[in-house]
Structures are given as structure tokens and as C-alpha cells.
Amino acid sequence: MTKILIIEDEEPIRRVLVRILIDENKNFQLTEADNGKEGMSFLKKEKFDLVLCDIKMPKMDGIEVLQKTKINNINIPFIMLTGHGNLETAVEAMKLGAYDFISKPPDLNRLLTAVRNALENKSLRTENNK
């Protein structure tokens, strides 16, 4: 079972992401967090295969979540989401190790392609490390 953490403060966007992912694959096990602090708490307790993370959130933003995962040696692909398609923020997220960067509301095909590619890339890296 593939475990995906969705960190998104806007509940309507979170619902859309959940629906898209469940429609794509019924075997996805989804966990939801409504801010970066809650998301970081999940990341410290559980293993996930992928994280979808908003950038602008209360309590802890997505960039800070990325920084903390790096500090804590949590090696999970992140797909960053933002309602403000800012190139500087995208570059910063990628420098911190984000796998991809998607504007909100997410385009269905773009999101699913990014999810599939991130999971496939993670699977290949895991195979190569055996």
C-alpha cells in the first residue's frame, strides 16, 4: 500500500486532492494535515512514500517543512503546491529537494503525472539501494 501525506490548510483543496488520488488508485492510503506543524508531526511518527505539501500555511509553511525533513534525514519525495506560482519559491523548494512544484488549483493530468513519476522514481532509488 502506498502512503501519501497531504499537508494543505485549505480544506476544499485538500478534498479535491483526496478525491483525485483515490480515483487514481484505491490502494493509496492517505493521511491529511491542515498545517505544516501537524504534517511534520506525522512525518516524524510514520513512513510515507510521498508528500503533497502546500507552501503558504499557518503555523509552519511548506518550505520550513522541507527544511526540517532534510535536517531530520527524512528522505521522501515532496510535490509542493502553491496558489501563487512564484518562480523564486519554486527554485527554493527545488534546492531543498522538492521533486516537483504545482500551481493550485492543480491540473488533474499534471498532478497525476507528478505523483506517478515521484513514486516511480522513489521505487527505482529504493531498488538501486538494495
Residue ranges and their predicted role:
Residues D54, T82:
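Active-site residues of response regulator receiver
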